[in-house]
Amino acid sequence: NAAAEIFRIAAVMNGLTLVGVAIGFVLLRIEATVEE
């Protein structure tokens, strides 16, 4: 089913984006802590 495939890909992309944002936020917090 093409619609199901598109929905699955969209969900994966959304998940990767959220993971990327979370990793970036953690790295920023670590950098701020180290600088102090």
UniProtKB/Swiss-Prot annotation:
Name this protein carries in UniProt: Cytochrome b6-f complex subunit 7
Stretches in topological domain Lumenal: 1-5
Keywords assigned by UniProt, alphabetized: Chloroplast, Electron transport, Membrane, Photosynthesis, Plastid, Thylakoid, Transmembrane, Transmembrane helix, Transport
Subunit record text: The 4 large subunits of the cytochrome b6-f complex are cytochrome b6, subunit IV (17 kDa polypeptide, PetD), cytochrome f and the Rieske protein, while the 4 small subunits are PetG, PetL, PetM and PetN. The complex functions as a dimer.
Pfam families tied to this protein: PetM
Keyword Calcium applies: no
Localization, UniProt: Plastid, Chloroplast thylakoid membrane
Spans through the membrane: 6-28
GO cellular component: chloroplast thylakoid membrane; cytochrome b6f complex
Lineage: Eukaryota, Viridiplantae, Streptophyta, Embryophyta, Tracheophyta
